[in-house]
C-alpha cells in the first residue's frame, strides 16, 4: 500500500516500550533481570541502524529468554522479503520490530515466539510502501488443551475489534506457515501470523499490531505460572531436547525472519538468539505408543481451539 502518512517514530517508541514491558515482566517472574546489550551498525555497513537485545540465560524459569528490538535499513530488500512481491525487489528498506523466543526450563512449560514489525520499502521518485507483520505461536512439548484454548482465545480477543474475519484468517496463516514440510507436522499448536498488512491504512493497521503485542503477556504468562512448578525428570528433559531439534530445523530451513536477517547482513547473535540452549537428534526415534510423548502428535495438526 502506498501512503505517506505513516509515522515511524511512533512505531519505534511503541516497540521499545513493548520490549521493556515484556523484559521487566519476565525478569520479575524468573527472579533474574534480563541483561541488556545495545548494538549499533556503522553507516558504511550493508545493514545500517541498531537495536537492543534483552537476554536471560540459565534462569530459574527460563533456560533462555531473548527479546530483540531492531531498527535497521538497507539499500535492497533481501530475497526472503520480496519473493512474494517481486515488484519490491531491489527497493531500499527500513525494518523495525520486536521479536522474542522464550525457552523455559520445565518441559511442561511451552516454548513461545512473538514478533511485531513494520517495514517500509522505498524507491527514488515513487511513494514509499509500508506494511505490518507479526504474530505469536506456542510450541509445547507436553501439551495441555487448556493452555491451547487460553492462548488462542487471547489471540482472538486481540484481533476481534479489528474485524471478526482476522482471527480465522491469521490462525490459518499461522498453521500453514509454521509447518515442517519434511516432518509433515506443525511446529506447535499455532496461534496467529500475519504479513503484508496495511489494508485499513496506517492508523488502524498500527493499532492492530499494538493489540497483538499488548496481548502477549496475557496469552503466555498464565500458562507458565500454571506449569513452571510441575515435577519432571530426566525422561521429560530428554524429550524436550529432542523436540527442540524440530524448532532448530524450522528456524534454519523455513523461517523468513531468520532468512531475512542473515540475507540482509543482520547481527548474527541477535538473529540466532531464538535457538534453544540444548537440542538433540536421534535416528528414526519413535515414542512408545500410548505414552505422554506419543500424545504430542495429536496436537501437531491444525485444530480449532476456540
Swiss-Prot record:
It is found in: Cytoplasm. It catalyses: coproporphyrinogen III + O2 + 2 H(+) = protoporphyrinogen IX + 2 CO2 + 2 H2O. The active site is at 113 (proton donor). Residues 247-282 are annotated as: Important for dimerization. InterPro entries: Coprogen_oxidase_aer, Coprogen_oxidase_aer_sf, Coprogen_oxidase_CS. The keyword Transferase does not apply. A divalent metal cation binds at residues 103, 113, 152, 182. The keyword Oxidoreductase applies. Its cofactor is a divalent metal cation. It comes from the Bacteria. The record marks 182 as: Important for dimerization. SUPFAM superfamilies: Coproporphyrinogen III oxidase. It is an enzyme of class 1 (oxidoreductase). Keywords: Cytoplasm, Heme biosynthesis, Metal-binding, Oxidoreductase, Porphyrin biosynthesis. Its EC number is 1.3.3.3. Its main location: cytoplasm. Coiled coil: none annotated. Substrate binds at residues 99, 115-117, 265-267. HAMAP family: Coprogen_oxidas. Homodimer. Belongs to the aerobic coproporphyrinogen-III oxidase family. NCBIfam families: PRK05330.1. Involved in the heme biosynthesis. Catalyzes the aerobic oxidative decarboxylation of propionate groups of rings A and B of coproporphyrinogen-III to yield the vinyl groups in protoporphyrinogen-IX. This is Oxygen-dependent coproporphyrinogen-III oxidase. It comes from Burkholderia ambifaria (strain MC40-6). The lineage of its organism: Bacteria, Pseudomonadati, Pseudomonadota, Betaproteobacteria, Burkholderiales.
Amino acid at each position: 500500500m502506498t501512503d505517506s502518512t505513516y509515522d515511524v517514530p511512533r512505531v519505534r517508541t511503541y516497540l521499545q516500550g513493548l520490549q521493556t514491558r515484556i523484559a521487566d515482566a519476565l525478569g520479575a517472574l524468573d527472579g533474574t533481570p534480563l541483561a541488556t546489550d545495545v548494538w549499533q551498525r556503522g553507516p558504511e555497513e550493508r545493514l545500517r541502524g541498531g537495536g537492543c537485545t534483552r537476554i536471560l540465560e540459565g534462569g530459574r524459569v527460563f533456560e533462555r529468554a531473548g527479546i530483540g528490538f531492531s531498527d535497521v535499513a538497507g539499500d535492497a530488500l533481501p530475497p526472503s522479503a520480496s519473493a512474494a512481491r517481486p515488484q519490491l525487489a531491489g527497493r531500499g528498506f527500513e525494518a523495525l520490530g520486536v521479536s522474542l523466543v522464550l525457552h523455559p526450563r520445565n518441559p511442561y512449560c511451552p516454548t513461545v515466539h512473538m514478533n511485531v514489525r513494520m517495514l517500509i520499502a522505498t524507491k527514488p521518485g515513487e511513494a514509499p510502501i509500508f506494511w505490518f507483520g507479526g504474530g505469536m505461536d506456542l510450541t509445547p512439548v507436553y501439551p495441555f488443551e487448556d493452555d491451547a484454548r487460553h492462548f488462542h482465545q487471547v489471540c482472538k480477543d486481540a484481533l476481534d475489534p479489528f474485524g471478526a474475519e482476522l482471527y480465522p484468517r491469521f490462525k490459518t496463516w499461522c498453521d500453514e506457515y509454521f509447518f515442517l514440510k519434511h516432518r509433515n507436522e506443525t511446529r506447535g499448536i499455532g496461534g496467529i501470523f500475519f504479513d503484508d498488512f496495511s489494508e485499513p491504512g496506517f492508523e488502524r493497521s498500527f493499532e492492530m499490531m499494538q493489540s497483538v503485542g499488548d496481548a502477549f503477556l496475557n496469552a503466555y504468562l498464565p500458562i507458565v505460572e500454571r506449569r513452571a512448578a510441575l515435577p519432571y525428570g530426566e525422561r521429560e528433559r530428554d524429550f524436550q531436547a529432542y523436540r527442540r531439534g524440530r524448532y532448530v530445523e524450522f528456524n534454519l530451513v523455513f523461517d523468513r525472519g531468520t532468512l531475512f536477517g542473515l540475507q540482509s547482513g543482520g547481527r548474527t547473535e541477535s538473529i540466532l538468539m531464538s535457538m534453544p540452549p540444548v537440542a538433540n537428534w536421534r535416528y528414526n526415534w519413535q515414542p512408545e505408543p500410548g505414552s505422554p510423548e506419543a500424545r504430542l502428535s495429536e496436537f501437531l495438526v491444525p485444530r480449532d481451539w476456540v
